[in-house]
């Protein structure tokens, strides 16, 4: 039965007030929302739905708050499947779901791919759902077993927190802002406590450790973060939004529309060259292709004098007859901080007395992208802009470089001292070459002291599965069942890995108890009754 207009109005304003009170919670003390409670409530339906993932989001927020406060870290790795998640939660307090792993092993089309985010947008949410359902099941199974035993025996029984919060990879959002909102909705419905989204362009997205990354303007990525928060607010959840920036190694950007990006855009300083794209089009029309086109581009690039505007001005000052060149450079750098290119040009004109040639359109690629010079300071610039809209911030990096991680953390915290940071302990890094083992052992702790309160190995699930599969298959081919005993079953028993009794692990006892409950206490078809082979392991 429909509400009357008066009832509808009263319910609306009650919800608006409830949302305003919710936003006053300390959880949101650093969060900026460019929309109102009235707008959020108007986008909700009449039926209030309580999402279980909200419990997980609250749990995750409490965890990272405590870790940041104590300068420690929660650390985890990318989980492949339900078996893995049940082993991870014994020792780790969060679970990560990687887009890379999902792309290679779990696309909803079953078509493997490298990490280009070209799989259907429900791929990673589906993996989250698989792990979340497993967490819920094993939690039920464990609770039933414990409550089936008297209190005095429970201390000796497993009491694992299976419900470790899941943080998942949202790539670039798989499209425009409505796609970001739909993806966020999927993640909340499927059990994610938090998601991360990166500032790459969706059609050209690459793994964080591949070349050819194209960024979107700062404002566009902020819109994505706002879209995530708006969708979570509509659904009434505390979902954590993690902003990832790939700007440390980026070389291209889609647009120069945001002045905050201007300082890192690269232009040509050679007025005698025609624009690169015009040259390439003419060469193609002349029948050139492949290596010939590449040679033309390489030659143009070598002659173009590509550099950022501030570097071009500094070079001009150094070449000028100014009495105190360093003072002029210092004044220029001080005055252009935070300014657009138009404003920076005016400042340069005042110092040099003339305009300099610098053209950011001339080097544009055939796709229309602008050249861009990334780096740690570039990433700091973006992180500072993202901070009011993100719960954590992550800079993707090429190496496990502590000095760089420190530079980034200090740069962000100089503006936003309470900003929580995340760090990818990537398997793309050669850890043996990067640092000695004693430093490897302390790396997570040292990063935690800098504010990196959540850290993760994206693909450890993939690599550990590949390693044991290779070791076992090789030994099995040579030794037969001896390999299974020595490499798998005996170590399982020695380490008390619960999967050694896989029927019990899978919930056979739990299901037997369900059957007994509905059949009055007796079942002649109990899975774990007389004859079950797991009696051999008692």
Curated annotation (Swiss-Prot):
Quaternary structure note: Homotetramer.
PROSITE patterns cross-referenced by the UniProt entry: ISOCITRATE_LYASE
Protein known as: Isocitrate lyase
Keywords for the protein's UniProt record, in alphabetical order: Glyoxylate bypass, Glyoxysome, Lyase, Magnesium, Metal-binding, Peroxisome, Tricarboxylic acid cycle
Subcellular locations according to the entry: Glyoxysome
Named cofactor requirement(s): Mg(2+)
Gene that this sequence comes from: ICL1
Claim: Metal-binding is one of the keywords in the record: yes
Residues that hold Mg(2+) according to the record: 169
Family: Belongs to the isocitrate lyase/PEP mutase superfamily. Isocitrate lyase family.
Any one GO BP annotation for this protein: tricarboxylic acid cycle
Pfam families: ICL
Record carries keyword Nucleotide-binding: no
Residue sites binding substrate per the record: 98-100, 208-209, 244, 424-428, 458
UniProt main location, coarse: other
GO terms for cellular component: glyoxysome
Listed InterPro entries: Isocitrate_lyase, Isocitrate_lyase_ph_CS, Pyrv/PenolPyrv_kinase-like_dom, Pyrv_kinase-like_dom_sf
Reaction catalysed by this enzyme: D-threo-isocitrate = glyoxylate + succinate; (2S,3R)-3-hydroxybutane-1,2,3-tricarboxylate = pyruvate + succinate
Gene Ontology molecular function: isocitrate lyase activity; metal ion binding; methylisocitrate lyase activity
